[in-house]
Amino acid sequence: MARYLELNPQNYSDEEYDYDSYNPFPNFEKNLASHYGTDFVPRINLDDFFLDDEDFEFCDDPLNCCFPDYLASLGEEEFIYEGDEPYIVLKHQLVSSTMWDDGTFTYPILPPFKTSSISYFLPKPGEVLHRCLMAVAKGMDPDLQVAVGTEFQFRAESDSSHPPDITTEDQGTVVATGPQPSAPAMATLATAATGTMPEEWKNFFSYYTTINWATTDETGKVLFVQNLAPRMNPFLDHIAKMYTGWSGSMEVRFTISGSGVFGGKVAAVLVPPGISTEGGTNLLQFPHVLVDARQTEPVIFTIPDIRTQLWHDMHDTSTSHLVILVYNDLVNPFQGGENGTSCTITVETRGGTDFEFHLLKPPTRKMIFGADPSRLIPRRSQFWEGNRLPGVITSFVCLPRMFQANRHFDCKRQTFGWSRPVHKGIEVRVDATNKDAANTTDIGIHVVTARNAIKSDIPDGWPDYYRTGEQVYNNTTQTFQEVKESVMGSAVPDSTATAMTWHHLPTVVFGHGTAVGSKTTNSKVLSGNFYAIGNFDQSGNIKLYPSYWIAKEQSAGGAPIGAYEDMVKRIDVLPTAQTTGGNFPVAFVSKFASSHNGNGVSVYNSQILTTSALLAQDVYDIGPNALAVFKIKGSGGYWFDLGISADGFSYVGGGNLNFSSLQFPLEATYVGMASLHNKLQYNLGGSATTL
């Protein structure tokens, strides 16, 4: 981008001039600055423009850009050495400078600047950059000697005067329709009948919540905590969907039921932004007021908007808090017996006189608050592992319905499962007592209890797919031949207090529910006891590793794991995805070792394990009717679009795609956001599309 002058070496030779101690042209800077209407040329250290040495890795020559076509629209830079005569500067300026389209001269950006012994200036900065900088400079100092050929004009679309080439919202072709009879009169009657008035949602209190204050609540107990936000009011929360930001205070009205009967006081504390609301009576160190339970009239508090910026975005939680806590215990003189009584505090809210919304947006567009979904799928398929059971993803399958709770997370970090998004040993403690009391062999039904659970005392990592109903176990040390549709694994000692006396690592089968005789009854809901069926003659801590699937039929190793909803285990809710807008749920298929099939049984996974881990760690910005779309491309060139929805399930644009045409390894590329109701695209060999 830069153009270099043909310089005489003697003018800038370090052997002839030492610029730190000798200046051969003492009037050089003054003469140069005079061409630009300034008195001096400021000195700038280019190193100050970079944060650290790592920044230089991105550009090894910041003064000579690698993209001249792009920067040509912004401007051109030129520099000269101090050894050059001032007339060369003037000549170079006149040769380089040009005229704008309107005939005005292209004045250089003011002022030029110096680095070391080199002076830079911009004779042709580009019209947009030039005029923007001039407008900013002139706004800071009206007396600054700058030249602006054409001043910018900023206006709203609704301004009355506008250029003819701009269409405003009040322009357009009027379509003839039947006139509304007496429109002004009808509008007046409607206003009179409904009481509609401008911004009426600001003028009255709306119910927000209720607080229970009991005689058993001790001094310092926090009854109510609320940060300043539009969601405090139902109308503000509704209107907020159309705006990007807000500012202003809110008023909160408290009404205590039973006033005049109860005694006691509560304190209303205003906590500034950025300070924790924990601490009980310590909160009374902040500004506060006291409210007596005998107060018969409602009490109104104002939560002021204390902020360090001009306005808040809709996700801003660094706002003031209103805390209501017990100051004096509630007393009911008519209370009889030891049972406590309580009163109810009704909370109503409205916007303050200074409350306003800012920056209009369509209600259907979502604010970008969460993490970027572009990293939800690893780029290379070599790193794709299923979230149901260990195994690398080898294919995909379209399903009319997809269901999975365990290790399945949505974009808000929520799960209905009981396992962390990682495949590891299941940490339990086994009881040596055999529930099959009549058994005289070494195989028994043993209760295991979770040592590491995240929900409902279910062992973290417990399998979510095996037979529902009765399961009979063949009590022999040689085989589990009668066991069908079950997960088998191995057990290893873990942090035992005494030496283990096992002669070998036991093989176990997973079950839960109730155990009677040589069978267990497994329900769809994980409840009751959890069992490890195997050879245990000693209690202690163990780890269980699911590693094998006992199939039902001899042929093909049985149905895929995850295919039947009745066999999918859950705690209460089973997240389910179904066809939407022409897009079908897709399962990630991996393989798991199985009987009757040397290639293993297929496993339907709702997510890639890495996706589950990322969703568990952070909130992602995926709207309720949106998809984060990735292009999955095979080595042979075939591809299809895969979209991840807000509930964590994945979709593709057809119900019968030829995934067999894909050649592994695959590569995932983030495309962007799309509507859930727009059909996703694909280009797979042998696939046909019906319009």
UniProtKB/Swiss-Prot annotation:
<dbReference type="InterPro" id="IPR029053">
    <property type="entry name" value="Viral_coat"/>
</dbReference>
<protein>
    <recommendedName>
        <fullName>Capsid protein VP1</fullName>
    </recommendedName>
</protein>
<keyword id="KW-0167">Capsid protein</keyword>
<keyword id="KW-0946">Virion</keyword>
<dbReference type="InterPro" id="IPR033703">
    <property type="entry name" value="Rhv-like"/>
</dbReference>
<keyword id="KW-1142">T=3 icosahedral capsid protein</keyword>
<dbReference type="Pfam" id="PF00915">
    <property type="entry name" value="Calici_coat"/>
</dbReference>
<comment type="subunit">
    <text>Homodimer. Homomultimer. Interacts with the minor capsid protein VP2. May bind to VP3 and Vpg proteins.</text>
</comment>
<feature type="site" description="Cleavage; by viral protease">
    <location>
        <begin position="157"/>
        <end position="158"/>
    </location>
</feature>
<dbReference type="GO" id="GO:0030430">
    <property type="term" value="C:host cell cytoplasm"/>
</dbReference>
<comment type="function">
    <text>Capsid protein self assembles to form an icosahedral capsid with a T=3 symmetry, about 38 nm in diameter, and consisting of 180 capsid proteins. A smaller form of capsid with a diameter of 23 nm might be capsid proteins assembled as icosahedron with T=1 symmetry. The capsid encapsulates the genomic RNA and is decorated with VP2 proteins.</text>
</comment>
<dbReference type="GO" id="GO:0039617">
    <property type="term" value="C:T=3 icosahedral viral capsid"/>
</dbReference>
<keyword id="KW-1035">Host cytoplasm</keyword>
<comment type="similarity">
    <text>Belongs to the caliciviridae capsid protein family.</text>
</comment>
<dbReference type="InterPro" id="IPR004005">
    <property type="entry name" value="Calicivirus_coat"/>
</dbReference>
